[in-house]
Amino acid sequence: MIAAPMQEGDGRRRSVFRPCIDLHNGTVKQIVGGTLRDAQDGSGGDDPHALTTNFVATHPPSYYAKLYARHNLRGGHVIKLGPGNDEAAASALQEWPNHLQIGGGIHLDNAVSWIERGAEKVIVTSYLFPECRFSLERLLALEKRVGRDRLVVDISCRRRGSEWIVAMNRWQDLTDMRVSKGAYKRDREREREADNESQSL
């Protein structure tokens, strides 16, 4: 669960809760950021010595989706942290169709199928950064496939010195995108370019 501070019109601050269902090996977990890493033996699995969790659920993901639906906690997401989570993610989406976003391994070829399985929106990061470099072409293609209203671009960052850099692949790989006021202005220009380009698609 994430508590995001928001400001009322009268200047007072309040918290808006964003429910999360983070899945690792089919189980709901709260993992300490940056501790989910690939194993060094080339097996394709996770490094068990690096992984640190704050919470490992005994209930299935569908339980939490049903709980969020009962309390009308909107704006939540289901994140698949690695392989082996598709079935668990689908079970959560089915409990509250069109109200939970889905992320983790989303790309051009599977985005629509997750919408069809009940996701309100798809969340994407790694697909937009081939070789860790941002691809506007991929973003436009994905927008055309699912529609802008169904697409969320995750720019989770890691700090390096005084900079915040967008990270991908379970926060292991740093991309070429820095988050700053200057980058925001450039992204606004890119967004205008994307608007013009998408109109001609």
Positions of predicted regions on the chain:
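Solvent-exposed alpha-helices and their adjacent loops that cap or buttress functional pockets
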Residues: 8-12, 70, 94, 143-146
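A short acidic, glycine-rich active-site loop
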Residues: 41-58, 172-178
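Intrinsically disordered, low-complexity terminal segments enriched in Ser/Thr
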Residues: 188-200
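N-terminal active-site wall of soluble small-molecule enzyme domains
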Residues: 38, 42-46, 57, 61-117
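Hydrophobic faces of well-ordered beta-strands that scaffold small-molecule active sites
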Residues: 16-21, 76-78, 98-104, 122-124, ...
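Conserved anion-binding
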Residues: 24, 29-36, 110, 115-189
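N-terminal basic/disordered segments at the start of proteins
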Residues: 9-26, 30
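Eukaryotic N-terminal low-complexity, Ser/Thr- and Lys/Arg-rich leader segments
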Residues: 1-15, 42-44, 192
